């Protein structure tokens, strides 16, 4: 165990690496930017990191990795979820195989954004679980739980740190190692991945249950 002084965004990035994330996609925007940067600086061999052209492209790329059984993460600020909402809503119905966490950093105030939005309303709208850490310590601990819950339920999970969580600094005790997860790979199966028309109705019943 090592003790490190970390910004909340750094804690999220390192927590994702320690949880075995294999693919990270994002679009920069305060207060979320340092999460992907931290992963890029600290990643080991076999971890893919990408600044995507926009949030929609980022979430679609992460979904592809999760379909193959890898743990994937997307990072963006709150207004970016507006751009990514189309694939997010479809993912609710399709589901995932590997853990997929969509980190959306909210900016109450707003302090550095054009609007104030609450991602928890998006989670309710999409019928997705949401983690809402209240401190950098909780963010580090919860990110691994978010991947585990995503795999347990077979659905993406939203993760909502706010500006003060993202940019607050704390001293954290953490493991100095990352979990290694080897994805099974994508298995072509029309009954599992072709959502329309039959699976749309079936999965709608599960979502609304």
Question: Could you tell me what each predicted segment is?
Answer:
Residues 2-9, 133-209:
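Flexible, low-complexity linker and terminal segments
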């Amino acid at each position: 165990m090592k003790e490190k002084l970390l910004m909340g965004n750094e804690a999220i990035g390192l927590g994702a690496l320690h949880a075995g994330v294999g693919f990270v996609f994002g679009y920069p925007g305060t207060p979320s930017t340092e999460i992907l940067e931290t992963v890029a600086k600290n990643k080991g061999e076999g971890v893919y990191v990408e600044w995507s052209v926009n949030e929609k492209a980022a979430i679609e790329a992460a979904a592809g990795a999760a379909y193959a059984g890898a743990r994937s993460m997307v990072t963006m600020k709150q207004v970016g979820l507006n751009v990514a909402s189309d694939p997010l809503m479809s993912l609710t119905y399709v589901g995932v195989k590997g853990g997929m966490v969509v980190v959306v950093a909210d900016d109450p105030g707003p302090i550095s954004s054009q609007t104030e939005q609450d991602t928890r309303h998006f989670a309710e709208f999409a019928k997705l679980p949401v983690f809402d850490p209240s401190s950098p310590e909780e963010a580090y601990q919860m990110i691994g739980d978010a991947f585990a819950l995503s795999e347990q339920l077979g659905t993406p999970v939203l993760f909502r740190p706010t500006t003060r969580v993202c940019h607050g600094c704390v001293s954290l005790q953490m493991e100095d190692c990352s979990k290694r997860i080897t994805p099974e790979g994508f298995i072509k199966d029309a009954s599992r991945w072709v959502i329309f028309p039959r699976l749309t109705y079936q999965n709608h019943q599960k979502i609304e249950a």
